[in-house]
Structure formats: C-alpha cells, structure tokens
C-alpha cells in the first residue's frame, strides 16, 4: 500500500511510523508489526507472525477473559471530505444494520483529505472495528522464548459459556525464568476469531 505524500512536522520518527502503520491498517485491513529483532528493525505483516504453538488447559495456568463494545468497536463508519471547490461536505458511510439493531449506533467518524478510495476505506474500517473487543490474559503459560508481542498463537480454552479455538495475537508478553523453568504471562487480543 502506498500512502499519499504528507508532511509530518514536530513528530518523532516513532510517531511517523505509527501513523503510516495506522493508515495502512485503515486502507487495507492489514496489520503490520514493527519490532527489534536482536538489533535489527523488522516490519512484518501480522499474518506472517503465526506460530504453531498451542495454548490449552494443560499449558496455561490461570486466565482472565473480557469482552466489550465500549472501546474500539464501531458498527457505523462515517468519513467526511470538505470539498473546497463546491463548498460542500461529501460523506461516505459503511454500516452493519444487524449490529446497530443489537448494540445501537456505535459510530466512527473521521475527516479525510481525499475522496480517493473513500468508500473502500469506510468498508475496511467497518470490517476492522465491527466486532466485540475480546481480551484474554493468561498467566503461567509454559514458556517459549520465540513468543513476542505481535505473535499469533493458537489458543484452545473453555471459557465457561463458550469455547475458544483460534489464533489470537499477543499484545504483551512477560517471560519469567526461575529454578530452570520458563513461564509467560500473555495479554492476548482477538476479534471475530472467537467461536461460540
């Protein structure tokens, strides 16, 4: 994906890179992860960070599971473009009526600089945000040093009223080495990947 030229004034390099990653995510629904790989900056598509490592009732210790529509969940996307030639505002909307009926209107609004691919961008944003936010915190998981933030792991757990069996993304990991044992505490995130 090629981002239109832009000026980033008084921004750190990290902020500029994050803006580029955010713009790419909005336009393509593809998430990329930038990380330090033993002194070498590496940029990877999240899909390329899958590991064939299973976390289940036997490899995980304790867990905490939450689901919410309070943050980062939108069932209506509205993009607005101020057309300076006509003096009118152009609106691009994507929405999911079934979720609006279930949750009410949860609207994402953004002003855009160009109408190029505006409808595609609205659809991509709806696809990205039109789901409950699900977080899973796992404690004392058998450790694997290859696991880092951004890694996708297979998680198969019974969570009471539902069964989870899917890849989830590691948002944060803490490795603990003690008495020749290695454990991890993981903050996981997934959207529609949780099966009911």
Residue ranges and their predicted role:
Residues 18, 22-24, 28-128, 135-176, ...:
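Acidic, small/polar-enriched beta strand-loop surface segments
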């Amino acid at each position: 994906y090629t981002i239109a030229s832009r000026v980033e004034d008084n921004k750190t390099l990290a902020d500029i890179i994050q803006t580029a990653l955010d713009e790419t995510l909005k336009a393509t629904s593809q998430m990329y992860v930038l990380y330090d790989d033993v002194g070498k900056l590496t940029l990877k598509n999240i899909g390329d960070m899958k590991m064939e490592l299973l976390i289940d009732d036997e490899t995980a210790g304790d867990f905490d599971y939450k689901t919410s529509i309070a943050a980062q969940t939108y069932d209506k996307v509205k993009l607005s473009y101020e057309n300076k030639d006509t003096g009118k505002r152009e609106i691009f909307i994507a929405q999911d009526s079934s979720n609006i009926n279930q949750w009410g209107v949860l609207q994402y609004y953004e002003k855009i600089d160009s109408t190029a691919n505006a409808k595609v961008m609205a659809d991509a944003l709806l696809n990205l945000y039109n789901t409950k936010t699900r977080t899973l915190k796992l404690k004392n998981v058998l450790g694997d040093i290859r696991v880092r933030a951004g890694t996708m792991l297979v998680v198969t757990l019974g969570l009471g009223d539902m069964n989870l069996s899917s890849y989830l993304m590691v948002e944060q990991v803490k490795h603990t080495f003690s008495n020749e044992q290695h454990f991890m505490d993981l903050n996981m995130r997934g959207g529609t990947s949780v099966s009911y």
